[in-house]
Amino acid sequence: MYPEGPKPEHDQFPLQDTQFSNQPPVHRSPFEDPYPEDQPHFDKQPLLTSPAYPPTQYPTSPPPPNFPGSPAVQQPYPPFNNNPSPVSPGVPAYFNPAPPSPNMHYGQAPRRQPRRFKTTRQVKLTKGNLVLDCPVPTAYLNDVPIKDGKEFTHMRYTAATCDPKDFASDGYTLRQPMLGRKTELFIVLTMYNEDEVLFARTMHGVMKNIAHLCTRDRSRTWGPNGWEKVVVCIVSDGRNKINQRTLSVLALLGVYQDGIAKNVVHGKPVTAHIYEYTTQVSVDPNMEVKKAGSKNVVPCQILFCLKEKNQKKINSHRWFFQAFGPVIDPHICVLIDVGTKPGGTSIYHLWKAFDINSNIAGACGEIRAMAGTRGVALLNPLVAAQNFEYKMSNILDKPLESVFGYISVLPGAFSAYRFKALQNDVNGHGPLEKYFLGETQHGGDADIFTANMYLAEDRILCYELVAKKEAHWVLHYVSSSYGETDVPDKVDEFISQRRRWLNGSFFAGVYALYHWRKVWQSDHSYLRKMMFMVEDIYNTYNLIFSWFALGNFYLTFFILTKALGHGVDGSTLTDPPFSPDTGETLHTVFNYIYIVLIVIQFIMALGNRPQGSKIAYTSSMVFFAILMVYMMFAAIWITVVGVKTVVETSGGQFIEMLEQSTFRNIIISLCATYVMYFVSSFMFLDPWHMFTSFIQYILLSPSYTNVLNIYAFCNTHDVSWGTKGDNTVATDLGVVKAKKDGSGDLAVEVEVPVEEKDINAAFIDAQVELTKKIEPEKSHRDAKTKQEDYYRSFRTRLVLAWIISNLALVVAIANTTVIDIKGKASIYLGFILWSVAGLSVIRFTGSTLYLIFKIFTG
């Protein structure tokens, strides 16, 4: 018999044996010995082996003589090609090719049934809840270093039948409080249908970070047993949506077993399946298994929550924050999207920021675009442009906002929050309350502004943290922490992603500016509140600038290309690249192409999905890039000619050169902008994107303004996440149940009229009904149709306001008959260029201050 062990954490028994035996299913009392003495071990399925470990040697005792189909052999597997080892050295057993068989079939092998023999047991409910302690496979346990302790020998399954907010009050608990452990880091990995490679990339990266925490033996918090203070929570959005190969990786980690979960418990439908286990293995993206004790792998406490239904990412965060958070009571919560790979020490650096400054409520690291092996992904101009965009945001934008203390968005792909700061007040009002409003007000009965705003609910959470009543929390950027993620490499995916980003950020930005007074109800110092006001002014200017970006970009193109011809005011360059008539012809042709492209964007955005218009959108981006090349040529030529003219007329005096509008507006403003890009990149010791991605970003910048903005604004009515559907079954027509008749065939019972008088009565009723005169009914729209009409009418009004305001700006500047001011085109071009330069100076100043503060605060 098995030796007597410690008492279980609760009055519970395993759901079933892990041994395969010839014993028939029997009913057992919970007070009988669950493991009979005469039942031998016969589970010889090997665990995936690691290159660092030789294959496990399994016992060679023969199977029971009455085991069905058991051959009289002494080895678990017959030798193949005179190789007695069941697996090839250094190669995981699951990936070794099987010996050829005369009965070989081709194609994908069918999925193995989870159990061939099951034992039915009586299981006591724990406080009315189904909780099962299931032994892990013996093959797994034989291949790991730690074999004692229930967290290593048993996987704990809980069938949750409650809403996340009722998890603790309904009597559910988790292993950490039962083991008396204090959790310092609670890491959540949100998942939908990502494949096994993306999941392993993230999970293996997290486990490498946990291993790094265990190497910090001089820390007061961490050390060799630091893994006991970290819990990794994996939340998968929908049981029918999860990738099956990802489930196989989870099963390999020991945290998932097939055939355990149940749909209904005591008449209540299960809302989430919760699996808990402390794994001792890790699977890297190459599907190689690393065991505890090897490099970068230590035990890891995993909490796997498999939601029964697909209910969006924000609902996954409800399970993390509302259900599991209060039970575990962590210090810091880290949010990571599956597919994002954290750097080897990134989680430690995030945690250290909270440890140094007790006023930090949230922090984020750098989000990097995956460039592939030796940067091969940057050969795709779409990836390169996004790489440049991400880099400059992390070098200029995030440091500036961190200096102010308010970061407009902590990216959900890789960020961290202090659990204490997230909590609501005694009345239930606070950051989490506003954050989770997005689940009920997104779509549903929400107004269109709120629905779009909650497309970027993480921005709402950031503002609510900073403006929390009677608190003084700030947000911080940690440049030494980073997470790598895949970016869209196809035009249709890129446009669809940016639609939600642009609409969510626009409406969330309006929300933050509209509620600027909330900051004055916080407990921040007067200086900090004034800094927030300065940041609000900066954000307001950016918001207005982005609203008129469509008109501003066209005006810049119009004025610069017109200057190579006869000019907006009729003047010509002193040294043009070609004759004024040729320049005027080129300007006219390119101008018409620009206008046609804009019209095409509106037509496609209002009626086509990007997935159905890939060629059209790709072609549009190519044409806009060609227009950008001509515009840059015009800008460079005007700059060179302007410098020569100014030097000749001013005698080389810099003061006199500054008095020339051409020199000021074009040369100084543009050079200042791009020089600051280079200088700031070198200051952060990360300049390579300026050489590998800058040109691609410049060429695609017209598409950012014209393609992405138009598609986003024209689809503000679309606030769906694509996860809702009709999952109910109508029963108004009756339910047909099949039964076997006397001959053993299936038959059904249905109710149909058979009496002649009933049939005739129905016929007469139909005749009478047609003789009646009815009043014409007024058509009524149902609630869903009314909401869709309201959303579309809002979209129409918004797009009209956007088009009219930008068109009015273009007409006022480009048409001399509307406003006849001498040199107005040059004046407005100077305003645009100096605005860009001024915003760049502010960002550069903030970036420099961030580096200075980092020297003293770490």
From Swiss-Prot:
Compositionally skewed regions (Pro residues) per UniProt: 52-68, 76-89
Residue ranges, compositional bias (Basic and acidic residues): 1-12
Feature: compositional bias, Polar residues: 15-24
Keyword vocabulary terms for this entry: Cell membrane, Cell wall biogenesis/degradation, Glycosyltransferase, Membrane, Transferase, Transmembrane, Transmembrane helix
CC annotations in GO: cell septum; plasma membrane
Subcellular location per the Swiss-Prot or TrEMBL entry: Cell membrane
Similarity comment: Belongs to the chitin synthase family.
Name recorded for this polypeptide: Chitin synthase 2
Originating organism: Rhizopus oligosporus (Rhizopus microsporus var. oligosporus)
Biological classification of the source: Eukaryota, Fungi, Fungi incertae sedis, Mucoromycota, Mucoromycotina
